[in-house]
């Protein structure tokens, strides 16, 4: 929770200039830092969108170019079947096609050495590993409407260009309540493995 607060604080105050209704695109694997960034985004009312790192550059551009994000959250690498996959080398191609991105927040893959990035013209680069060193403001969380946009996800793109699907705060909460409590009967201290593509 503290890191989520730090993330939302960084979005607002630390020159990234992200505010309510702004879009944040994430090109990251499922790691705790991704969740912290998502919670930080939702705390200030910005709209989260994400693509799996196994998407190639064209798949990412097809999706994120539709939403015009101000900030791209990206991990430096991920691992598949024991092999290291470098994602950060894809960044220049993404930035070349999505001109609205003004800032990049780089997450380090847990337990691995961070790949630092060379400066990119007209793009501000931030490192998530430095967020914890910032002094965090203790503002009260703002309440948003049931209908407030929370996240934009995408159709598969099998029948043409992927289509944006906007998920609203209230609907996401109701869906999780329904799935977790009614469908799956999840109780405190239960372990859950939820596999999806």
Pin down the residues of each PLM region.
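Structural core segment of the AMP-binding/adenylate-forming
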Residues: 15-16, 43-129
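AMP-binding/adenylate-forming
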Residues: 46-49, 55, 64-76, 150-153, ...
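Single conserved hydrophobic/aromatic residue that forms the stacking wall/gate
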Residues: 1-7, 11
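Short internal alpha-helix immediately C-terminal to a glycine-rich phosphate-binding loop
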Residues: 9-17, 178-185
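Alpha-helix termination/capping residues and helix-transition junctions
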Residues: 4, 15-18, 66, 97-98, ...
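Conserved acidic residues
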Residues: 22, 70, 102, 147, ...
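Conserved AMP-binding/adenylate-forming
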Residues: 12-61, 191-197
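Conserved pre-ATP/AMP-binding loop-to-beta segment of ANL
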Residues: 105-106, 118-154, 161, 171-176, ...
């Amino acid at each position: 929770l503290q890191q989520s607060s730090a993330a939302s604080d960084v979005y607002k105050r630390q020159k990234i200039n992200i505010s309510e209704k702004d879009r944040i695109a994430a090109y990251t694997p499922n790691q705790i830092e991704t969740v912290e960034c998502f919670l930080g985004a939702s705390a200030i009312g910005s709209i989260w969108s994400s693509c799996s790192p196994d998407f190639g550059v064209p798949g990412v551009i097809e999706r994120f170019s539709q939403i015009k994000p101000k900030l791209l959250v990206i991990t430096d690498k991920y691992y598949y079947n024991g092999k290291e996959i470098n994602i950060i080398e894809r960044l220049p191609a993404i930035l070349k096609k999505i001109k609205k991105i003004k800032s990049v927040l780089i997450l380090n893959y847990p337990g691995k050495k961070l790949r630092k990035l060379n400066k990119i013209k007209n793009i501000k680069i931030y490192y998530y590993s430095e967020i914890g060193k910032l002094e965090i403001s203790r503002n009260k969380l703002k309440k948003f409407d049931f209908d407030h946009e929370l996240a934009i996800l995408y159709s598969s793109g099998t029948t043409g260009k992927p289509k944006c699907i906007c998920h609203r705060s209230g609907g996401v909460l109701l869906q999780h309540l329904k799935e977790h409590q009614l469908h799956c009967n999840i109780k405190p201290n239960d372990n859950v493995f939820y596999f999806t593509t």
